[in-house]
Design a protein with these regions (language model features):
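Asp-box/BNR beta-propeller blade signature and adjacent active/binding-site loops
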Residues: 22-374
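N-terminal secretory signal peptides and thylakoid transit peptides that target proteins
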Residues: 1-12
Length: 374
């Protein structure tokens, strides 16, 4: 659990022949959109509502990458990303609330996903040299819950709003988790690709919902490569191609293709899946988007020099991917990424990610506006 987001060691590209030359990114602007520099912000997801408004869900209120203070927040923009609201806290459990995904259903409901973690307790157990005030702060946060209460709170969660996010349901348990949450399929179903986190099996696969996100049912498991440990598959995301194939990307930490994105496909609506295979892309995790012209876009963090965020385009439904398009390359280190992209009505792209910047005390949310040339 603690190594899931460790800065990754260098690894050579695999299956280089599957990567072909293609378009480039024309980046118009990059800006910081979070407004509370006293807090660490992490692992956002960007969504666009039916009126064109933008919403970002993320883990906010934090002290560090791992801490007991994480909560789920949302910020909004009604002008294409130029200005952003003050954060709305929608979940603040007594333990760490982490990566936040967001999906807007065909009915207009908002679904936000997250998971809780006790990883901060391992950090705290080795914090003997901390200042007394920080030790007391973490201890008091931890003592809000008993061991039994912590065990109850440790799970994968979803919240639902049917009034545009003014009010939210209580969090309810879902069978799996991934950073960027569910997607909408052409048949109206909601599909959630992810991983079981706090179970003994660590199964990866997809669930679907046919009732606007109220309930979720396990649909299909993704097989494991013969040499792989399923526990080293992480942070899945899905997209549906124009022809109905579903493509899923997987963050891989196995010895074969370490630090690369693996891909699996389904041609029967998510019931069965191909064995994951490398696509020649180092960097993760990947968020997938189908562009209006039918091409697929993958956005992913790049945690080695040049530190930043990249994207690639597929013109053939995920069979091959272009060379990288640089969204940002000015990062100070590896604590960045989880980019999430939407396409505006004018065809331009907005990508949001988190990043620890050298001139900021804590990680912030950054936004790029850009276009694909070619």
């Amino acid at each position: 659990m603690l190594t899931r987001r460790a800065v990754l060691s260098c690894a050579p590209l695999a299956i280089a022949g599957s990567v072909k030359a293609g378009p480039r990114a024309s980046v118009e602007s990059i800006s910081v959109i979070s407004r509370q520099p006293e807090f660490y912000h992490g692992w956002p997801t960007l969504a666009q509502d039916q009126q064109g408004g933008l919403l970002v869900a993320y883990s906010g209120g934090r002290e560090a990458h791992i801490c007991p203070f994480g909560r789920v927040e949302i910020i909004r923009s009604s002008d294409g990303g130029r200005n952003w609201s003050w954060p709305q806290v929608i979940l603040d459990s007594p333990i760490d609330d982490r990566d936040a995904g967001i999906c807007i259903t065909p009915a207009g409901s908002l679904l936000v996903t997250t998971f809780t973690s006790l990883a901060y307790r391992t950090v705290f157990a080795h914090a003997n040299d901390w200042p007394a005030e920080r030790l007391a702060r973490w201890r008091s946060a931890d003592e809000r819950t008993s061991p039994k209460q912590r065990a109850y709170l440790l799970d994968t969660w979803m919240l639902r709003s049917t009034d545009g996010g003014m009010t939210w349901s209580s969090p309810f348990r879902v069978p799996l988790n991934s950073p960027h949450g569910p997607v909408v399929l052409s048949d109206g179903r909601l599909l959630y690709a992810g991983k079981q986190l706090w179970t003994s099996t660590k199964k990866v696969g997809v669930c679907d919902s046919r009732d606007d996100g109220k309930t979720w049912n396990w649909l299909g498991s993704i097989p494991v490569r013969p040499s792989d440990n399923v526990a080293e598959y992480h942070e899945l995301h899905a997209v549906e191609t124009l022809h109905g194939r579903i493509v899923v990307h997987i963050r891989n930490h196995n010895a074969l293709n370490p630090g690369e994105t693996l891909q699996s496909e389904s041609d029967d609506g998510g019931k069965s899946w191909t064995v994951p295979h490398p696509i020649g892309v180092w960097g993760l995790p990947s968020q997938l988007l189908r562009l209006r012209d039918g091409r697929l876009l993958m956005s992913y963090g790049y945690r080695r020099a040049p530190f930043g965020n990249q994207a690639r385009v597929s013109s053939d439904g995920g069979k091959t991917w272009s060379e990288p398009l640089l969204i940002s390359s000015d990062g100070a280190g590896g604590d960045l990424g989880y980019p999430s992209t939407v396409q505006l009505a004018d065809g331009k792209l907005i990508t949001v990610w988190y990043e620890s910047m050298k001139d900021m005390p804590h990680a912030v949310l950054r936004k790029a506006q850009w276009s694909i040339v070619g």
